[in-house]
Amino acid sequence: MDIFGVLNMVCGLALFLYGMHIMGDGLTRMSGGKLESILEKLTNNKIKAVLLGAAVTAVIQSSSATTVMVVGFVNSGIMKLSQAAGVIMGANIGTTITSWILSLTGIEGSNIFIRLLKPSSFTPIMALVGVAFIMFTKSEKKHNIGAILVGFTVLMNGMDMMSAAVKPLANVPEFTNILLMFTNPILGMIAGMVLTAVIQSSSASVGILQALCVTGAVQYSAALPIIMGQNIGTCVTALLSSIGASKNARRASLIHLYFNLLGTILFMAVFYAINAVVPFGFLNDAANAAGIAVIHTTFNVCATVVLLPLSGVLEKLACLTIRDDEKQEEKDKEFQLLDERFLAQPAFAVEQCRVVAGRMAKLTKEALYAACELLDNEYDEEKAERVAALETRIDHYEDKLGTYMVKLSHANLSKADSHTLSMLLHSISDFERISDHAAGLMHSAKEMHDKGLKFSEMAGKELSVFTKATRDIVSRAVKSFETGDLEMAASVEPLESAIDSINVKIKNRHISRLQKGECTIELGFILQDISTELERVSDHCSNIAVYQIEVPQDELDAHEYLQSMRHVSGNSFDLMKKNYKMLYALPKD
C-alpha cells in the first residue's frame, strides 16, 4: 500500500466516524430526551432493563454514550447501582446493530432484489432526500431526519472507501503475517482492546475490522479474539467519565468493565475448550462482514444470558473494589442532577435543570412566606435565621444552575429545549431576587424588634393585606413555573397590577397619618422599605409568569407583553384585576 492508499484509508475512517456521529446525533435529537426519561423510570425489572438498554443504544448508536449516561444517573441518584447492571448489559447488545447495518456492504449478487439491499443502491437517494430536508425545510423534525439520512450515507461511503483502500493489502505478506499473529487469543484481545480504547467506540472498531475483511486475509481465528478485546476496550469511555464522580457512579463503570471482562474470559474459555475437543472448521475460513456481526452479537447475547442472573455478584465485586469510607462526609445531593455527563444528552439535561429550578422555586416561596410571617406576627429569631439561610441557599442554586445552563447552552439544542433553557435562565434570576427581598423584609422586622417599634393598628391591618396579596402572587408564580400552567401564569399580571394599587394607597395613607402625627418618621422609613420590597416581589413574579407565556411562542419581550396586556380592551385582564382589588381591599380608615 502506497501513501495514497494510506490517505484513502484514513479519509475513509474519518468519514466513517463522522457519519456515525452525525447519524447518532440526529437520532438523539429525534428522541428529544424521551429515551433517557424512559431509561430513568423503567429499570426496576432486570429483563426490562436489558431490553431498554439495548433499545436506547440501538437508537443512539453508541454503547459508550448509554453507559456514560447510566454512570450519570447513578451519580445523581436517579438510578440505583442494582438497576445499572441490566442497562449496561443491554447496551452491549444494542451496539451490535451497527455491525449488522455495516454487513450490508458485503452483499453480493446480480439478482435485482439483492442489489437493492446493497447500500450503494439506496444511499444516493437517502443523501438527496437528507440534503433536501436540511436545506429546504424549516421543520426541526425534518432537519433531524435529514441528518440521520446524510449521516448514514457518509458512514456507508466511509466504509466503502476504507474497504477499497485496504483491499490491496491481501497481496502484502507483512499484513498477512500480522493478522496471523492475532490468531493468538491474547495478542488478538490486546489488539482489539487498544484499538477500541483509542477511538472510544466498539461500533467503529468492529466496522474497521469488517472493512479489513474485504482483503480476504482476516480469518475467524484472528477476528474472534479481536472482537473480544474490542468489547473490553469500550469500557475505557465509562471509566474515564466516572473520574471525580460518586462512589456508586464509579462502581457502575466497574460493573461495565467486570461484565465485559468476565464475559470474555468465560466465552473464550468455553469456546477454546470445545475447539480443543471438537475443532471448529470455520476458524480457518476468511471472515466476512456478516460473520463479524454474528460473532459480535452471539458473544454479547451469551454473556448477558449467563451473567444477568449474577448481576448481584458483579455489584458486590464493584463494591469490594471501591469500599465505603464511613468517615467521609455525605456529599451534598442537591445538585447531583446537574451532572456534566448529561450535557451529551441535552434534552435530558434541560429536564434536570427544570427539576432543580423547581426546587429553587419552592425554597423561594418558603423564604418569602417566612419573611411575611415575621411582619404579621411576633418576631421570631429562629425564623429570621431560617430566612437568611434560605437566601444563602437560593444564591447557591442560582450559581450552580446558571453555570450549568451556560455550559448546556453551547450544546446542540432543539428549538423547544433552547426556549425552555432561556426561560429557566431568566426565571432563576427572578427567584434569586425574590429571596433577596425576603431577606430585606426580615431585616426590617428585625430592626423593628430591636428598636421596640410597632406600627399603628390600622397600619398593621393594611400591611397584613399587602403581605397576603404578595403571598398569593408568589404562590401563583411558583405553581405556574412548576406545572407549566399558562392559565395560572396569566392570572399573575392582573394581581401584580392590583398590588401596585395597594402599594400606592398604603403610601398615601401613611403620609396622611404622618401629617396627623399618628406615625413617626422612623416607622415611616421602615414602612417605605417594606412596601418597596413587597412591590418588587410582585414585579419579579410578573416576570416569571411572562416567561412562561412568551417563551413557547418564541418571544421574550416582557415589557412589550405587559403593555399589550394592559392596553388591549375586551380581555379578562380588567375583570381579574377588579376581582383582586375587591379580594385585597384595604380596611377603611
Task: For each feature predicted by the language model, list its residue ranges.
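Helix-loop-helix hairpins and the membrane-proximal interhelical loops
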Residues: M1-K46, I145-V194, L212-T215
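Interfacial loop-to-helix junctions that mark the boundaries of transmembrane helices
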Residues: M1-L7, G109-S121, F175-M181, S221, ...
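Hydrophobic core segments of alpha-helical transmembrane domains in multi-pass membrane transport
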Residues: M9-I22, G53-T57, I125-T137, V150-M162, ...
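Hydrophobic alpha-helical transmembrane segments of multi-pass integral membrane proteins
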Residues: T43-M69, P185-I208
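Membrane-embedded alpha-helical segments of transport systems
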Residues: V59-T66, G86-L102, P119-I125, L155, ...
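Membrane-interfacial helix-loop connectors
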Residues: M69-A91, T95, S99-S121, M159, ...
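Cytosolic, long alpha-helical scaffolding segments
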Residues: M79, T105, V218, G244-R250, ...
